[in-house]
């Protein structure tokens, strides 16, 4: 039986990935303008979130799924920076929380590493 930490990671990433397919336009808004094909990036990142979320449930692939999620968290970090630097484009979200997401990303990376990647 997977640990509570693994189950929480799986639920969080799988739900976030599914959300990319339910509300793709919302996620496309946070893609920095210098990146091409925002909708494609939303669908690709959503698929990887789902794959990683499910993958951490299986001990045989947990290590690789964890590293995939860490790489994904690093890959989407520019979107978090874009949001923090352009709060006027995200007026429904408190500005302080846009900045709080930046260090939170590293907390998530540490969580994934400890739960799924550590030997």
Could you say what each language-model-derived stretch is?
Residues 1-119:
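Membrane-interface extramembranous regions
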């Amino acid at each position: 039986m997977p640990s509570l930490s693994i189950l929480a990671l799986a639920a969080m990433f799988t739900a976030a990935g599914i959300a990319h397919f339910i509300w793709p336009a919302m996620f496309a808004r946070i893609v920095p303008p210098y990146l091409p094909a925002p909708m494609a990036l939303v669908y690709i990142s959503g698929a990887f979130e789902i794959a990683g979320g499910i993958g951490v449930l299986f001990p045989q692939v947990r290590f690789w799924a964890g590293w995939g999620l860490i790489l994904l968290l690093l890959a989407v970090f520019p979107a978090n920076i874009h949001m923090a630097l352009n709060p006027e484009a995200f007026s429904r979200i408190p500005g302080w929380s846009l900045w709080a997401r930046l260090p939170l990303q590293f907390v998530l990376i540490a969580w994934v590493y400890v739960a799924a990647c550590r030997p």
